[in-house]
């Protein structure tokens, strides 16, 4: 639903960067929040009563592969390399454009229901994901997943596909669909491929997303090939900078972490996928001590198996507490920022905060549920009690995408029925 102005009336608002809980109205004009205070006496095109709800910034999924919902449950209880080589890649080679379209559309519906407004996606047939993104109404950063395996002919194909997507998104000129460069990983992309990506990042002023230090196998492969760490390789090609969003970062050394911090790069932490594939535990304590910008991602639903950032926040917090045997090791404020403000910082968006002048990316959580009450600590309620279905309303760039738990942009039942026809599992 496109509105010139929206007034959220009487909600419990998580206001500002310090997350002060306040009873207030929120006025949205265009794509921005223009006023947050009690009793706003101004007309609006849409007035929503949120007096029994918690009003929070919507979430940013900093790393996913949305069409992989098609592969949910396909390969279970196996490590990453076996998971990829024996199960995922063989099936992905059979996926058609329409499979990617319907799979991503289902994924976007799932993300919307858990309060996600923005996501970073790496896959193929990205034009189909762009189409689904515009239809559902979320905001996407889409990159073609480049893999050349040191094959010069394959590299040329990957470069052409990337250039084609860049031109497609540029021509699309959408406020919701953005381009991002997406080399798969240092172990699947040659040095020349990574160097080309670095050059295009500067030429196109483009962000870059990549898998980094996800497994010990990756570290071993890169050290045998280059005699250094994957982070050093990215530094050598000119990719280690503030435009980089590196997923996982499990096996980073202390020196790697210092370099990432100095460069202003972002780590997209994916705790559920990391645990499910037995890949390891991200060194969050050291990353935060070194002021690394840490965002949150779900990874694909094939290795998670959901796209629920609320669940991801809970896992991110609990995992660190038990690994360090210290319940104070990470604060709820830090975890919540990873799902909101830190992701916005990585993408260069003025979002992730409910305050005047910020993008009107807002999720409304219905508090009329036993497992959410009482709200003694709003952040604790969100991180440890809430689940995806608790999000009642989603506003993306001032547009109401979901209201009363019903998507206004697409026929959800039709998408689910259609998905059953194209599922390859």
Curated annotation (Swiss-Prot):
Catalytic activity, EC: 3.5.4.28, 3.5.4.31
UniProt entry keywords in alphabetical sequence: Hydrolase, Metal-binding, Zinc
Catalytic activity field: S-adenosyl-L-homocysteine + H2O + H(+) = S-inosyl-L-homocysteine + NH4(+); S-methyl-5'-thioadenosine + H2O + H(+) = S-methyl-5'-thioinosine + NH4(+)
Residues reported in the UniProt entry to bind substrate: 92, 184, 214, 299
Main EC class the enzyme belongs to: hydrolase
Binding site for Zn(2+): 63, 65, 211, 299
Spans traversing the lipid bilayer: none
Cofactor needs: Zn(2+)
GO molecular-function term, one example from the UniProt record: 5'-methylthioadenosine deaminase activity
Cofactor note: Binds 1 zinc ion per subunit.
Gene3D superfamilies in alphabetical order: Metal-dependent hydrolases, Urease, subunit C, domain 1
Pfam families in the record: Amidohydro_1 (PF01979)
Highest taxon, organism lineage: Archaea
NCBIfam families: PRK08393.1
Record family assignment: Belongs to the metallo-dependent hydrolases superfamily. MTA/SAH deaminase family.
Function field: Catalyzes the deamination of 5-methylthioadenosine and S-adenosyl-L-homocysteine into 5-methylthioinosine and S-inosyl-L-homocysteine, respectively. Is also able to deaminate adenosine.
Name by which UniProt lists this protein: 5-methylthioadenosine/S-adenosylhomocysteine deaminase
Biological source species: Pyrococcus abyssi (strain GE5 / Orsay)
Gene: mtaD
């Amino acid at each position: 639903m496109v509105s010139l102005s929206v007034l959220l009336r009487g909600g419990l608002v998580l206001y500002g960067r310090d997350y002060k809980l306040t009873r207030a109205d929120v006025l949205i004009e265009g794509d921005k929040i223009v006023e947050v205070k009690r009793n706003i006496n101004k007309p609006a095109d849409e007035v929503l009563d949120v007096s029994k709800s918690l009003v929070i910034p919507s979430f940013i999924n900093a790393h996913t592969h949305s069409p992989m919902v098609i592969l949910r449950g396909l390969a279970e209880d196996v490590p990453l390399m076996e998971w990829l080589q024996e199960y995922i890649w063989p099936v992905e080679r059979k996926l058609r454009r329409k499979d990617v379209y319907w799979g991503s559309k289902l994924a976007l519906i799932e993300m919307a229901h858990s309060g996600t407004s923005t996501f970073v996606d790496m896959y193929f047939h990205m034009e189909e994901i762009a189409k689904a993104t515009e239809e559902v109404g979320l905001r996407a950063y889409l990159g073609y997943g480049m893999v050349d395996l040191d094959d010069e002919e394959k590299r040329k194909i990957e470069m052409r596909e990337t250039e084609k997507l860049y031109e497609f998104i540029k021509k699309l000129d959408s406020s919701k669909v953005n381009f991002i460069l997406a080399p798969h990983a240092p172990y699947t992309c040659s040095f020349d491929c990574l160097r080309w990506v670095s050059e295009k990042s500067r030429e196109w002023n483009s962000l870059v997303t990549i898998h980094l230090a996800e497994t010990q196998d990756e570290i071993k492969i890169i050290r045998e090939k280059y005699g250094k760490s994957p982070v050093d390789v990215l530094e050598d090609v000119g990719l280690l900078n503030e435009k980089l969003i590196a997923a996982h970062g499990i096996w980073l050394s202390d020196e790697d972490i210092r370099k990432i911090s100095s460069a202003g790069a972002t780590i997209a932490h994916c705790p559920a996928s990391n645990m499910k594939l037995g890949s390891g535990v991200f060194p969050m304590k050291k990353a935060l001590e070194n002021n690394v910008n840490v965002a949150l991602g779900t990874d694909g639903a094939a290795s998670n198996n959901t796209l629920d950032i609320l669940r991801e926040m809970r896992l991110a917090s609990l995992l660190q507490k038990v690994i360090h045997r210290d319940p104070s090791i990470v604060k709820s404020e830090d975890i919540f920022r990873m799902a909101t403000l830190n992701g916005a910082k990585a993408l260069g968006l003025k979002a992730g905060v409910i305050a005047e002048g910020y993008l009107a990316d807002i999720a409304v959580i219905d508090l009329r549920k036993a497992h959410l009450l009482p709200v003694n600590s709003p952040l604790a309620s969100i991180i440890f009690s809430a689940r995806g279905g608790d999000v009642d309303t989603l506003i993306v760039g001032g547009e109401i995408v979901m209201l009363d738990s019903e998507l206004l942009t697409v026929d959800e039942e039709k998408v689910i029925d259609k998905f059953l026809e194209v599922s390859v599992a």
